[in-house]
Each structure stands twice: as structure tokens, then as C-alpha cells.
Amino acid sequence: MPKQNNETDLEYKRRVIDIKSASFCGAKWYNATIWLGSGQTTSCHHPLPHAIDLHEISQNPAALHNTTQKKKEREQMQRGERPAGCDYCWKIEDMSKDAISDRVYKTVIHSEEDLNVAFARPSYTDFNLRTLEIAFDRTCQFACSYCNPAFSSTWVNDIRKNGPYINLVSDGRGHFTHAHDRSQLYKFGETNPYVEAFFKWWETDLHRTLTELRITGGEPLMSAHTWQLIDWFKANQGRSSTRLAINTNLGREVDVDRLLASTQGIELDIYTSNETITGQAEYIRDGLDWSAWVDNMEKIAKSGIRGLHVMCTINALCLPGLPAFITTMMMFKRSYNRNFPSMSFNILRFPSFQSPYVLPLALRQTYADAIEQVLVQYQDDSLMHEHEVNQLTRLVAYLREPVVGPDLPRMQNDFKQFYTQYDQRRGKNFVETFPELKEFYEQIH
């Protein structure tokens, strides 16, 4: 195991990571997210994606991951410098000298031998992945408020039907202004060279070197390529020790029964997303049916798969209901075990006007207090993982940070502009759904 003698995350960091450099992260070598629809990659979900060179992958499928940009960032980490794209972790670490950022969690999953090899090899060396998250396309029946057309075909339909969201001055990336056609470079039925390169690399190396292959989307269970991979695992049992993981929104339309039946005998983890309960969850994650989601969670928890994981994207709207959501998930744990589900709490940064920092400090402190009460209630419970306690602890500290600067009024204006248009397009009502935020919302002009 990567950790020794029940050491804490901080003890592990000091023993394994800090002796290499002040910025080393195993994810830069051994982990990747790759969007095959757009031909982009990143080392984890925090840095922005960048383009994969089409010529390079025609000669070397491993260039899907081993891009020029990643090799430059590896060299920076070997020298103890901080790559700019990894600022999510640097901000967490700068909050206190012993703060644990995600680079610890992205590193601890790899063997010390692999980590030593990564640090010692020249930065231009190609590495085979150990963990990979892959998206074949953006087909999805949800259009979550913090998502955008680059990752959801339902979001594309909104923009094409209703036009761009307007008057969003802080959205410099234009998340909600166009259909992001570059996110789906090839039409359905056309040959996609990025998909071809992936399956080549899978056959030559990845099925041997990957410890986990995680399929995301869009909604991956709506992609034929996902079922193609599941069929490969069924037909080649014993040939690969790779664990299969699938991100799914567990919507009404998702055929959970087919998934569980098709993966019998395959080591499977299921990841899903949510961060609050009932109508507030349905507002944020447009397309969600809360009752259907809970029913699917129950079905999976009873199925005997390896693990069930819930990813919480911490945004401004989820904070009122987050304590109740955590309590609901603890009830699941008590009924099944601590891994059904495990939880992660990732603070949303983009779009910035949906981040928790858009709220006034007094509101954020109120929600920090409520989350802290839940944390105190459960932190010594054997059902809680150390990473869950640590991530909630850092969330409480984050919410209590004062925020000043010229961008805050613009972010708050965009918050009101966006949700006003979101309500009109989606048939929703912000004030009725979030009475806790009514006063704040209505005073924005």
C-alpha cells in the first residue's frame, strides 16, 4: 500500500512527495482525462484542457497523454516550480503550511516505485498511464447549471434553440455563448482519429498498465463506445487487471439494470454526482429526478460492485442543502458500508459567478457553521474516510475566507443575469427553490 503504518495524509506527503520537490504531483505522469470528441487532455480535473497533436497520435498513440505541454510541466515539477494550470492546489496549500491539496490524493494512489521513476526520468520521456478518465463524446440528457455545451448535448440544444446567454461580463471563456462545436469535431458515424488512437493504445499497452479506466461523458452510458469497451472486458476476462469505473448521472433514462447485468464478473466502480437534495438538486442538475437518483443509488449499493462514489461540485447554490445531503449519504453508508458511497467535495471555480465566493461573507459563514456542525457530528465515525473529513475541513476554511476585489460585483451581477435567463429557458424559479438566498438574490441590480 502507498501509505505505511497508518500514516496520515500529511505524514505521507512529507515522506514521499516533499523529498522530491515542493510541487511534485504523480498525476502529471500517471493520470489523465482525455476528451476524444474534442481531442483535448489534462492531467486531472483542475487544470484547463489543452489540445492533443493529431499528427503525433498518428505516429504514437501514447501522445494522447504525453503532450508537449505536460512534458514542460513535468520538468517544472522536477525543479520544484509551480505550473500555472495547477493553481487550484496551490491556493489550497497557501491557506496554511499543512493544508492537504488534491495533489496528495492524486499521488498516493501510485506506487512509490512508479513515483521515483517519474521523478528521476528525463521530462521528455513517454509514460504509460496508471489511471485514465476518458470521454468519447458529449451526449448527455442533463444540462446542469455549472456545465456547458462543451460537455452536454442538451446544453447544445438550449443554446441552438434559445441563443446565447447575454450580459455575462465575467464569463471570459464564453461558456454559455455558443454551441462549442469544437468539442465534437466529428459527427456521429464519422471516423474519429482520437478514438482510433485510444483503442490502438488500449490494445498495445493500456490494458496492461492501467489500474483504473474511468469512462465519463456526457453521459457515457449513452455512448456506443462505452458498451464496446464493456464488451471487450466481458470477452477478455483475465487478460486485463484494469478496474473499470463509469461516471453516470443516474438519471431516469440510464439503464442501470443493463449496466449491472453486463458487468457481472468485472471489477466495477460507479461514480455519480450530486451535492444537495430534492428540488434544489433538480434545479442545479437540470434533468435530474431526485427520487430516481436515490432509487438507482439503492440498486447499485445492493448489487455487489466494488464501490460507489458521489462527487460533490461545491457551488453557491448547493450550500443551503449540503449538510442534509451529507446526512443522507451517511445513512447510505450505515445501511451498506463506508464505500457505498464514498464522497468527494470539489470546490467549483468556473464559471466563477457560480462559485461559493459569489455569496456575501455573512452567508458563507452561516453555511460554514452548518457544514462544520455536520463535520463535528461525523468526523470520528468509522464510516467517514480521512479524505472526506479533510475535504470538508478545507471547505469550511475556504468559506470563511474574506473576499474583496473589483470582480465581486461583476460576479454577482452575472449570477443574477444567468439564473434569470436559466429560469426562463428551463421553466424554473430561483426564489421559490432557494428561499435561503432570496434576500441576496433580489438585492442584486
Language model features: what each stretch is:
Residues M1-S58, A62-H65, I100-V108, V156, ...:
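Radical SAM enzyme [4Fe-4S]-AdoMet core and its adjacent flexible, acidic
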Residues D9-R14, H65-R79, N128-A135:
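Short, intrinsically disordered, charge-biased short linear motifs at domain edges
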Residues S21, R82-G85, E133-F136, C140:
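Short metal-coordination and nucleic-acid-contact micro-motifs, chiefly zinc-binding Cys/His arrays
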Residues Y30-S43, P122-A150, L210-R214:
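N-terminal pre-triad scaffold of radical SAM enzymes
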Residues H46-E93:
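Membrane-interface junctions of multi-pass transporters
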Residues W90-D94, C147-S153:
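Detector for the c-type heme attachment site
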Residues S96-R130, C140-F142, G163:
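Recognition helices and adjacent regulatory flanks at domain boundaries
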Residues L129-T139, A150-Y194, H207-T226, N236-D255, ...:
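Core AdoMet radical
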